[in-house]
Swiss-Prot record:
GO terms for biological process: phospholipid biosynthetic process. It comes from Pseudomonas syringae pv. tomato (strain ATCC BAA-871 / DC3000). Its EC number is 2.7.1.-. The active site is at residue 268. This is Probable lipid kinase YegS-like. PANTHER family: LIPID KINASE YEGS, SPHINGOSINE KINASE. It is found in: Cytoplasm. ATP binds at residues 39, 65-71, 92.
Length: 305
């Protein structure tokens, strides 16, 4: 019989969330031994995961947003444990959870604790792991809302350029991406490297990504020679910028830029001139809905030990 024991690692801001308290009480009534710990500062998630594993917990619940989820997923993977993860989405965006079909209702999300876990991949870059997506936007300054005209033409990529108020403020970076049977070099405006499908609060930069295929989805938004003219033409023609993306699906990709690259890993900043992104197949056991859109393989008949 499966041990019904778990630890909920909850973002400190959610400590007074009555829905969480009620849902935890319900799980305990259902026979779950569910302990709760709160994060307070950077590094707490990893420490609490390690403490939970040392205490014999084989099931962790991540209660928070995308950043909390990334921290806990990374800590579990680094511990090389068979412990599984349930996602309790309590953030603003909840990008991985939404794309994976995890309910946003607290009680319904915790029902997934009783569903057999599935092996999912992680992405790795610069010694850091991510569950959802690495994104990069160039020339963006987060100082104001993106103008309405730009939102119309940029669509799902608009959030990468938050702060732009005129077409002339778009700047490109010269980059080179290399992977198995793939090579692209040129000026780019934005980049998404996804294990999950969406980022920035629902924007599908990698709309067909699967979290269990051992591959990363690459989405490149190239910069045309005349950025302003091209974007204006797209706007006037009512076309979306999704038609401009170059896409690939690779086990690894190397990204180089002499100008340097600012990357966002589910809220974790990373920068560098030469970065290698690698998929880590089956690195984590996650409790997801059986019909989750990000799962492509057939589930195992037996739950992991």
């Amino acid at each position: 019989m499966t041990q019904r024991r778990a630890m909920l690692i909850l973002h400190g801001k959610q400590s007074l969330n009555e829905d969480v308290r009620d849902a935890v009480a319900d799980k305990r009534k259902q026979g779950w031994e569910l302990d709760v710990r709160l994060t307070w500062e950077a590094g707490d998630a990893q420490r609490l995961v390690n403490e939970a594993l040392a205490a014999g917990h084989r099931h962790i619940v991540a209660g928070g947003g995308d950043g909390t989820l990334r921290d806990i997923a990374e800590a579990l993977a680094l511990a090389a444990t068979k412990a599984s993860l349930t996602i309790l989405p309590l953030g603003t965006a909840n990008d991985f959870a939404r794309a994976a079909g995890v309910p946003l209702d607290v009680s319904k999300a915790l029902q997934l604790m009783d569903v057999a876990p599935r092996a999912v991949d992680l992405g790795e870059v610069g010694g850091k792991l991510f569950l959802n997506m690495a994104t990069g936007g160039f020339g963006s300054q987060v100082t104001a809302n993106t103008s309405e005209d730009l939102k119309k033409v940029l669509g799902g990529a608009a959030y990468l350029f938050t702060g732009l108020t005129r077409f002339s403020e778009l700047h490109a970076a010269h980059g080179e991406l290399t992977g198995p049977d793939f090579h692209w070099r040129g000026d780019l405006l934005a980049l998404g490297i996804g294990n999950g499908r969406q980022a920035g609060g629902g924007h599908e930069l990698c709309p067909t990504a699967l979290a269990d295929d051992g591959l990363l989805d690459i989405s490149i938004l190239p910069a045309p020679q005349e950025v302003v003219g091209t974007l204006r033409s797209l706007l006037e023609g009512g076309l979306g910028i999704d038609n401009m993306f170059i896409r690939a699906r690779l086990p690894w990709v190397e990204l180089k830029s002499a100008q340097g690259l600012d990357i966002n890993l589910d809220g974790e900043p990373l920068s560098g001139e030469d970065l290698r992104f690698v998929a880590r197949p089956g690195a984590l056991q996650v409790h997801l809905p059986a019909n989750s859109p990000v799962l492509g393989s057939t589930p195992l008949l037996n739950r992991p030990d």
